Structure formats: C-alpha cells, structure tokens
Amino acid sequence: MPAIFLLTGNPFVDAGIFVISELSEKRIEDIEVDDLKRLYTKLIDVYFTEAWKKNLISIFTKNHPATHNSGTPERYKKFLEELIKDIKPMHTSGSCVACGRRDESNVKIAKEKSGIGKHLVPLTGSADFVNFFPNATLGLEMCSVCLLAIQFMPIFLHQCGGKFLLMHSNSEKVMRYWAKNCVAELNKQIALDNFTGCYSNDINNPVNSFFRSIEDMIVKYDEDWHRENVFIRFYYFSNYAQSPFVEIYDIPTPVFRFLAYVKQVDAYSEWRELTGRAYDRKGNQVYDRLIRGESIVRYFFKGEREVFGNWELLKFYLKEVKEMDEKRINAIRDLADRIADLISRLNDVRRLFQLETVKDYSGFRNVLRFLAKDAVKVGMEEPLIKFDEYVGLILPDGAMGWNEVRDLLLFRIYEQLHDWLKSRGSEIIEGENL
C-alpha cells in the first residue's frame, strides 16, 4: 500500500506525524488507514478532559471542533472520521500548502464559515481576512491527511509559562525521541487517570526549558549525538483568541554537538553545575549566550582557581561553537603550559595574580613581557613566546579579544597547576605595577 504520510517541513504537520508513528509503533511509511481508525478515538478520550481542553483553546482557539461551545465528543468524532474517509493517494503535486502532494480537504466541517484557519492550523488567519491567505482565498488550502496529522500535534507540545514549545528538527531521530517522551507522558496520564495536559518539565522560561529537554534526551538515548548534524528550531507560541504570539529559537548544529560532547566525555554533572550557576532573574546566561552566539568561556571558571571540565571539553567548544582555528587553540594551550611550568619553577604566584587581575590590553602585554623576562632568568631553553606566534596565533586581531585569550590561558594554567595551587591555598602576592 502506498504511504499515507510524508514529512512536509511544516512543523505542526510533522509533529503530528511523529506522534502517530509513535502511537502506532510503526515507521512513518508503514502507517495504514486501519491504524488511524484505531488511534483517533484516543484523541476523543483525552482532548475532552478538562486540562487538555484548556490547552487546546490556546492551541486551536475556541472554534475548534473539540473546544467550540457546541463541540461534543460526537461532533469531533465525526470530524476525524471524515478526515480519514477523505484520505487520497499522494500525487506528484497538489494544492496542499503543507505536503504539496494532495489537493484541499473536502471535509465540510473543516471549511465552515471561514475555511481552514487558525482554529484548525495554529497561527494562521481567521474569519474573513482573506488578504492573509494566498490569492485572497477563504482560508488555507490543506489536505485531509495534513489536517489529521495536526490533530495529533498537541501531544508533541511542551507547555511552558502559559504558552507552548513546538520543536522541529532536520533529524528524524530527534523528532522520534521527542515524540516518544511525549507519548510516554500521555500514556502515563491515561494509566493513572490523571490528565494534566501537554507535557511539562516544570520550567517556565522557554530557553531554559528546551535546553533542559535537549540535554535530557541526549543523556537518555544512547546515540553518537556528537557526530550528528542536528539542527533544531523551537517555536514558543500561543494561538489564544485575539493575542496570538510566537517567538523562534534556533539551536545550531555546533551547539547541539557541544551539548552531546559534554555527555560523551562524562562531563554532564559538571555541565549541570556550570549552568546551574548561570541563573539570574532573566534566565540562564549560559543558555542565552549559546542562543545568541556569544562566548561562554568565562563560565568555565568555578572560582578560587578551579575550572569546570578539562581542556578537551573547552577545546571542543572553541572549535565547534566558536569556530576557532585548531592551530590557534593549540598555540594558546602550549603558551599556557609554558607559563604554568615557569610559575612552578619560580615557586611564586605573583605573575599568576597579575594575569588574573590585569584590566586592559596594555597591562596584558606587560604581564607577558614580565613572564618572558622571567623565562630568561630561570634558564628556559626556548623563548616563552615568539613574535610570529604572538601576532599570528595568540592575538591575530591585536587588542580585540585579549580578555578571552587571557581567560583561556588561565583555564589551562589552573588545570596544569591544580595540585600545586591547592597546596598553596589562596596565597596572593602582588607584584610590579603594570
């Protein structure tokens, strides 16, 4: 039998397709009409509970067949049955705005008054605002298969802060695991006869919520996630009445790979501690910076000359997320190793203190100059730093980014001198003026 469903790129439709796949315990291409006839009754049993109906009002508005004042289980049942009856084979083209493989639905209830609008497809137009739709048509042109998939979509959502998070990814693996978690939550509600609505991890900030969900998925499912080219987009939305709302957040592939690498090197507990320290009243500064493409290097420091993770973890972040050249990363590491060796030979934390407290680029250069002189005094065979290395790799942009280079040097020095520093306690010795 030809496949019924095809992934469309429409986040609402695709979410519903993965829910159907998980509920039927079949691959998407193997789903049959008989599966749909068996599954649609579950929607009726669930959606007419108080908590789910409340969610549906903000997902589909009060004009949806399950939420309308005249809505009854029988009315919604008829709607779902007619969508299933209207399933037609896929073609090479069609007018459906989602799949493009079938023509518009012939189901009457889907086209009442204003056609297919926000009461059936969230965040689209409604009523007689025909200028919202292509060619001033009365509502969207969408086939019955895609409309049916959207009916399962709410199960895929996470409720968060009075709105909903919809995840969409280029990775079928990510979409499948996301659906698996949500369906497991639904089955739990059914088994306990305790209906609480869409899945929630009890985090009200959307950025914090979806980062935690991604991290939990990476930890829970044993995959080589750090080798996957995963891109994730989150839609944080509400389709409620006169105040629809949507914000879009992207998790780029390098950020996902970094989160996966944290698990790969068994640094997850330290990562949780790192991010746990980054919360403030506005959210989580580490997660927010990853979303904005800003550096999180400073957050790898615990304080008291201790760091989270190790150089390999930081290197992966620098290479994957910051897109720093590996030769430069290695040059900074090697310089830090030479400085660490020098400090231990001097048996003095003076230079380390100066490096920690320097305020500007000029002061930073002076610390390096003092260190270079110290290297000569103790008889180091090679120069601490060479000219070409300094201008070509350590600070190729001059003063720009000097403070991050300083932080990277300190990270490696703390790692290399961990035991030595620990034995000296919190000793601080001030030295020459910079």
Task: For each feature predicted by the language model, list its residue ranges.
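Basic, glycine-/proline-tolerant helical and adjacent loop/strand elements
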Residues: K53-I203
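Proline-rich intrinsically disordered, low-complexity coils
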Residues: P2, P11, P65, P73, ...
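Helix N-terminus capping/helix-initiation residues
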Residues: N10, E32, C143, G293, ...
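Conserved small-residue
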Residues: M1-P73, Q416-I429
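A sequence-composition feature that detects small, non-aromatic residues
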Residues: A3, A15, A51, A66, ...
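Intrinsically disordered, low-complexity regulatory regions
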Residues: T196-L434
